[in-house]
Each structure stands twice: as structure tokens, then as C-alpha cells.
Amino acid sequence: MDWVLTSAPALAQEIPGIDELIVDLVDVDPGDAEWVRPGEARAAPASPDYDAVIEVAATARDLQRAAEMIEREFKTGSAVLSMYRTRPMPARIDRARRAGARSPGVKYIVLCRFHADMPQSAVQRSWAHHVSLALRVHVGADIYIRHWVEETLSPGAPPVEGVTELHFPTFEDMCSRWFIDDDGRRQIIQDIGHFLASGTRLYTSEHVLKAPDPA
């Protein structure tokens, strides 16, 4: 998967209008820290669903150019490529992302599929209502961002309707401070059950290749 990290900088070089470029390598084994809802299967760190996630923030025109370049440069051999256009909804950002190095800690990403019998407006309302609980319970996370999927760009890509990212500044924070306590964990499991049908869980290392200049 390292070839993704070495190849991705060409995106920013070819498309200077890209505001932010991040590569998340799915290379973290959560071990006993992994959490699942009752009845869910655990992830398989040795054979994850994806090897990497590439995040691009840019104008609509530059996003289209980036998608075309990713399709051309990264979809080789047996590689499976799934691209989505999302609308980010930051809830907590307590640390600035700095370009040029691996970010500390672990970035946990969930590709969300919501209950099929729920109208989109109801899902959005329930997910937005969940934010205050998540901020109170996930005390170890210094970044919490939700993404609403507005368009699937890859024909035949698996259905993904939302993306959640929680970033823990250290592995220990993920292990011991994911939830404020057992009751908080129970509340999270109960609340997401109202709108989340299933999710693909990815434990990643974040590499920021380009970031907006600090204010």
C-alpha cells in the first residue's frame, strides 16, 4: 500500500488548485481496542476491505480532474477503486493538520450505510442529533468529522451514504479513552442503532500531503 503514498503527491503537483490532500493507509491493527456492536463481525486487520483512503478537497472542477487522474493512475491490475463526493461536517477539530508528515495517533474511519426504510431527511436529522452525544462520550478523540455522501463517482462502487472519522492523538487514547465510561459506550451503541444499518471500519495512519495554510 506504500505505493499509494508515494504516488499521491502527483495529484497536487498536477492540480495546484487542490486545497487539501490526505492519504490514510489502512495499516493499524486495533487489537483488543476494536469495538463492534452486538452481533457484528470484527474487522480483519490482515485483509481489510481497502488498502488506503485518498481525501481531496478542491473546487468542483478540480475535484473532477482529480477523480479522472485517480481513475487513470491508481486503478491498475486487480485494484478496486471506489470514489465518492462528500460534504464534510466538522464537529470537533482540536488540532491543526500539518502537511509533510504522518499525523500522530490513529484515524478511525467508518463507511456508513443507513437504514433503507428511513427517508434521507430522517437519517440526516438523527445523525445530526447524535453529534452532541458523540462529543460528550468520545473524550479521547481530538478530531471528529462527519461526511454526507452526495454522489458516487465510481460505477458499481459499494453503497456508502456517509463517512465518519474519529482521530485519536495516540494509540493509547484509542484504547482507553474511546468512551468516557461503559454507560457512554452503551448510549452510543443504542443511539447509532436508530439510523446506522452497517459500516465498514478502517483503522488508519493519516499522512497529510497538502493542507491549507494555518490562519
Name what the model sees in each region.
Residues 1-215:
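Macromolecular interaction modules
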